[in-house]
Amino acid sequence: VVVFDPDDRVLLIEGRDPAGRVPGHWWEIPGGGIDPGEDSATAARRELWEEAGITEADLGPCVWVQRVQYTFGGWHFDQDEFIHVARCDGTTQGPGGLEYLESVAFGEQRWWSVEDVVAHAPRTIPYRMVEFIEDLAMGRVPEAPIDITPEDHHVERWRAAGNPD
């Protein structure tokens, strides 16, 4: 979920690979899997609570989709992702129900100005978030979800950014 506060700042959560296979850290949006019986909107609301303690948010439509493959915590994932936009009052209570792997992987939660995200281009998940976030912050929601599936060069750049060598 790309969630904005009233000042158009976006919430990002610092992440690290607890297995140490992915060097460095990154900043990611709240999100996770879709449980049986859920649609993507229901899963988005649940994940906002689990990962950020956000209980009140105006959830918008799915704005981005992507297919990604990655390894995290020693597990390989191959998944389709449906990313919604949301607005909230900026109140986060901290994680409300992290799974064990998330509890050892997640660090600081921070509201970033979109200007800082674009200027500093931190390593993010989704990989291509920086390319598309300004439109969402300005309220420009696409009529249909945009496919932001990373290409090989996006993944290589992301990996290189976390490698201190």
PLM regions and their residue ranges:
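Exposed, low-complexity/repetitive linear segments and helix-based recognition motifs
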Residues: 14, 25, 78, 144, ...
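A generic membrane alpha-helix/interface feature
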Residues: 18, 71, 131-133
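Nudix hydrolase/Nudix homology domain
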Residues: 93-165
